[in-house]
Amino acid sequence: MPESPEVQALAEFLAEHAVSRRIETVDLDEFRALKTRDRPLAELDGATITGIRRFGKHLDLQTDAAHLVISFGRAGWARWDGEAAPDDAPVIARMPLNGALLELTDAGDWLSLGLSVVDDPLEVAALAKLGPDPLDEAFDRAALDRAVTGRRKQLKALLQEQETLAGIGNAYSDEILHAAKLSPLAHGSALDADERERLFLAVTTTLRDAVAARRGIPPYRLKEAKVAAMRVHGRAGEACPVCADTILDHDAVASWQYCPTCEAAG
């Protein structure tokens, strides 16, 4: 699942390579991906890309005609100008850009990529409901406190709730809780001030360090860079890099990993 650090890196890449290019057309191979049936993709034919902005795990492609909001969902992604791809993800949409090509793919068993043509990105319900984004410069300890204080919900689920904090998914929530030394099963309401401080520092440091590490990497390599950087997520059975205990897997609705020694608090 694309999460905010990789989507931010993609946004910066496209800001450098796609802005000021003209969209020749948008060829859609899977009609279900278009979520705004009353706003066809043809509205973008001939439009010039004027900006790229990230909203949580979503991308807003701004043009002089309309906005194209790209919701990557569970397995959507982008491919630039015919670059090599590490997987055979089906291409859902193609956008020739006068001399370049932007392709949108989806590698999932079911289609999760969504495209919306709108005048304002906040017309997309998922964007309008987003909570504060830890990658925003304005995000501070008070914003984190408001997000978790009094919440009788497990931290693992709370961190992934987009209305609470924007941009965090399964992988980075594992990394954040490991860095904060907090149990994924602890409730937000159970955290004391020191634990909330640890969580705040882990959230901001983990995500911002990830953005810095992904910056400049071409889109097709961002997923493998993310996987390689994980310290606990996806590493069940390996030694914890902090305490050397064995990382365990919790296989519920979605598999997630944790260190039973480091993450015993909360």
Model region roles, listed by residue range:
Residues M1-L113, P121, D249:
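Gly/Gly-Pro- and Ser/Thr-rich, intrinsically disordered tail segments characteristic of DNA damage-repair
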